[in-house]
């Protein structure tokens, strides 16, 4: 179960957000736009950033989900532990490495960011807009990770179920379509838990 008794049936970030859809729907529209935004890193690179930040935060749910999306795009799952070990020697595009160093530092030690971190990205050919998009992906997944871990949903993660539902391929096609399909198929309750009283403990 999660840390929230009335949320016991919720096993994913999607369902958590849909339980308060009046609050979270605009945010999910934003995430859909962000991950499909033409400027900045490619869709694959954004998914790599999402998975990498989630692994750094030890969020098994978000890491597993976005690692599988990356794998559906052709990324080797062994990339991510190699990125954690050493970005410089990891088998990833050289241009992306300063961005990955940037989001790693932003995730783990945000108070230590400097202008040199940004300049490393500019020297590699990234624009200010590109870096803003990368920062936004990093920041969004740090938020997702804390939502999952804070609610205790991470303990219910089942990677096989995620793959068997074809979720990685559906998310590649667009986050909004993925959420719309979940609602249409009854996989999420948008009315949400309504227990306003403190749980009995």
Residue spans for each PLM region:
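Hydrophobic alpha-helical segments
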Residues: 1-201
